[in-house]
Amino acid sequence: MNIFDFFRDRKKESTASVAKERLQIIVAHERGQRSTPDYLPALQKELVEVIRKYVNIESDQVQVALESQGSCSILELNITLPDR
């Protein structure tokens, strides 16, 4: 066994572990997006329409997020209101 083979084999292992880690991150990200309900964009649009009846806002001033913690789901609504 030559000294260069030692470094070459070690590099292959580290490359494989880096690839595995990246794949795990991608899979976790995809799973997180899949758990988001399909109705959230429609809900956000309807909320903007209702809020516009009372306050002049743009659609990007309303953010809707759904978080799950165990068996409990939390709907978070953030509205940036204009100054008077």
Curated annotation (Swiss-Prot):
SUPFAM superfamilies on file: Cell division protein MinE topological specificity domain
Keyword annotations from UniProtKB, A to Z: Cell cycle, Cell division
InterPro entries: MinE, MinE_sf
Keyword field contains Cell division: yes
Pfam families xref list: MinE (PF03776)
UniProt GO BP: cell division; regulation of division septum assembly
Record carries keyword Cell division: yes
Coiled coil: none
HAMAP family membership: MinE
Function statement: Prevents the cell division inhibition by proteins MinC and MinD at internal division sites while permitting inhibition at polar sites. This ensures cell division at the proper site by restricting the formation of a division septum at the midpoint of the long axis of the cell.
NCBIfam families noted in UniProt: minE, PRK00296.1, PRK13989.1
Protein family according to the UniProt entry: Belongs to the MinE family.
The protein's name: Cell division topological specificity factor
